[in-house]
Structure formats: C-alpha cells, structure tokens
Amino acid sequence: MRIGFLSHAGASIYHFRMPIIKALKDRKDEVFVIVPQDEYTQKLRDLGLKVIVYEFSRASLNPFVVLKNFFYLAKVLKNLNLDFIQSAAHKSNTFGILAAKWAKIPYRFALVEGLGSFYIDQGFKANLVRFVINSLYKLSFKFAHQFIFVNESNAEFMRNLGLKENKICVIKSVGINLKKFFPIYVESEKKELFWKNLNIDKKPIVLMIARALWHKGVKEFYESATMLKDKANFVLVGGRDENPSCASLEFLNSGAVHYLGARSDIVELLQNCDIFVLPSYKEGFPVSVLEAKACGKAIVVSDCEGCVEAISNAYDGLWAKTKNAKDLSEKISLLLEDEKLRLNLAKNAAQDALQYDENIIAQRYLKLYDRVIKNV
C-alpha cells in the first residue's frame, strides 16, 4: 500500500512516528512523509524516507492564506495517489483530512495527541480559535474513517462535539524507546561529576523537562523551588521562543531553578535525577513522564487531563493539585524525605513503562489500520 504521514512539523514525524513507519516499511508498504520545509526535512531524508514538501503557514489565521495552503496540499496529495493517510495535530486533522477527501484518498486516519494551548488560554483570540477548530473538526468527523486519541479525556471531548463512537480509538501514548530509556545505578563518582558539570550543589536533583511555557507549570515549579531550595537542586530543561505563552529568559534565569535550555542529553539527565516533575495544566499523554518512568524515577505530576492517565496516584508517582505550588512542593518534599516511598514508586514506574514500548504501540496502530480498512 502507498501510505502518507501528514504533519505540520517535521519534528513530529522524526520524534514520534518513526516506529510506526518502520513497522509499515518492514511489511513492504510504501511510506511517504508529507511535511513543510523545516530543519527536520533533511534529517527525515537521511533516514531513507520519501519526503514530500508542501507549503504551510503555521501561525497564519488569514483565510486567504489558509485556502491557498489547502488547495496546494490537496494537489500534492492527489498527485501521490495514496491508499491511506495518517494525520496528526489540529490543522492536519481538519484541513488535511478535508484535502485528503478532495484528493480521493480511500482511507483517512486522524491522531489527536492533545488539544493544545488554545484549549487552556482564555481571551477573545483563544475563544475564537477554539470555535474555529471545533467547527472544522465537526466537518472532518464526516470524512475521517478513524480518530485515534492518546487519552480518554480528549476522546470524550470529541465525542461531545459529535464524533461517532465507531470512529473513536484510544491508544495511550505514541510509545517510547526502552532500549534508550531504562533504569541504571549511577555510581557516586559519576554523580559527583554530573553535579560538577552542571555547577550545582551536591543535593538531590528535581528535574522538569518541558518547553518553557506557562501552561506547562513553569511558574509553580519555580515557586516550589524557592520553598525547597535548601533541600534539593531544581533543574528545568526545555527550549523557548518569543511568544506570550513562554516564560521570559529574565524569569527563567532568576530564582532558585537552574535553567539549562534545550538539551540533547535527556537520557543522562533523567538517569541522574532523583525526582521528575511535570506540573502541567493539560496534557495529551506526556512522553517525558513515560521516559522518566522507564528510567525508574519517582514522579510528581499535576492532577490534570493526560497526566492522571500516565501516572497512578501513590502507585508509580504522586498527583499534585494543578496550578498549586504549595501542594506541588509538599509532594516533592514528601519524596525527598521518604526514601522508601520514593524507591517504591520508582520501581513501580519502571515496571509500568514496559507496556509503552514503541514497538508494542506501533503494532497496535497497524492492527487498527488493518481492521478499519477491512471493515470500510
């Protein structure tokens, strides 16, 4: 079969779709990656993928620009003569599915990995964008054969918008690489070197990995660090850009948190930390939490959508109240003080992470594709 993976960003394909693509190629399907030109385009080609570039204005709400992008994409898809397409993210799941229908692609799948910042933010623009997105989804419901969700909350949201039950499938997580993320014992000499390289005190490390967005809980993390600075090192890893949803560099470089920016040594950071924290306001199914679990770390997450499906409270981590720095600091403090609890949660976390092996998840996708195609 000729299969297309459609995304508004090459990074999404590169980091999250490769296990599924590999599984499809292993069974001799022909796979095309359809993305805008960006810094990941060549990386995808270097992996031996057939990359098709299309025009896309990611931030534009101009209807004329959107229509131009739509018809260009529809033409690209029609020329590819695909048997089925897998989209992901709002614009691909709406305009992309509509373009795929126009291009007469027989089977159309949409993946919802989370609702995003517009479903957290308030104000006229956020409300308007939500209304537009919801309206477009209602239209795309008619033309997608299956919507795949990474959590039950998002599935319920779309169900309430009018998505029929027979078009809903929940596959939790996009999977993680367990050959890369696994528990290890860090010898004292290596931990000493790690402290030295980060230029931090010899105290337990509380790590947060996320883009420096306010709705990821950056404010609460910094406030907790201030409360617990004598007990632990608080480290934030994640990139930022210039938009109001991101914390400023001035904020990030102040306070009791060591802000490291974007890093490539995520495995080493996870294996050397003592506690992993994600105090987000809303998630899809957080990959960073699964990677921390796979490394055998005790975890604290906020009790928000997505996080509560990735962590079972008091089994493989703890829930803290969303947008509540005091409760977050209390949960972190509990783990710092109770080593037995911390180690027990970490052990359970590592065991639970096994079910999210990327190869297992990839096979679930393939079985879904085959089932839907057989029954359409």
UniProtKB/Swiss-Prot annotation:
Catalytic activity field: N,N'-diacetyl-alpha-D-bacillosaminyl-tri-trans,hepta-cis-undecaprenyl diphosphate + UDP-N-acetyl-alpha-D-galactosamine = N-acetyl-alpha-D-galactosaminyl-(1->3)-N,N'-diacetyl-alpha-D-bacillosaminyl-tri-trans,hepta-cis-undecaprenyl diphosphate + UDP + H(+)
Pathway(s) this gene product operates in, as recorded in its UniProt entry: Protein modification; protein glycosylation
InterPro entries: Glyco_trans_1, Glyco_trans_4-like_N
Domain of life: Bacteria
Statement: the UniProt record of this protein carries the keyword Ribosomal protein: no
Tagged with keyword Glycosyltransferase: yes
UniProt GO BP: lipopolysaccharide biosynthetic process; protein N-linked glycosylation via asparagine
Principal EC category: transferase
Keyword terms: Glycosyltransferase, Transferase
Enzyme Commission number(s): 2.4.1.290
An MF annotation (GO) of this entry: N,N'-diacetylbacillosaminyl-diphospho-undecaprenol alpha-1,3-N-acetylgalactosaminyltransferase activity
Function: Adds the first GalNAc residue on to the isoprenoid-linked bacillosamine (2,4-diacetamido-2,4,6-trideoxyglucose) carrier in the N-linked protein glycosylation pathway. Acts first on the undecaprenylpyrophosphate-linked bacillosamine (Und-PP-Bac) substrate to yield the disaccharide.
Note: N-linked protein glycosylation in C.jejuni consists in the transfer of a heptasaccharide (GalNAc-alpha1,4-GalNAc-alpha1,4-(Glcbeta1,3)-GalNAc-alpha1,4-GalNAc-alpha1,4-GalNAc-alpha1,3-bacillosamine) from a membrane-anchored undecaprenylpyrophosphate (Und-PP)-linked donor to the Asn side chain of proteins at the Asn-X-Ser/Thr motif.
Family, similarity comment: Belongs to the glycosyltransferase group 1 family.
Protein name (Swiss-Prot/TrEMBL): N,N'-diacetylbacillosaminyl-diphospho-undecaprenol alpha-1,3-N-acetylgalactosaminyltransferase
Gene source species: Campylobacter jejuni subsp. jejuni serotype O:2 (strain ATCC 700819 / NCTC 11168)
Source organism phylogeny: Bacteria, Pseudomonadati, Campylobacterota, Epsilonproteobacteria, Campylobacterales
Name of the gene: pglA
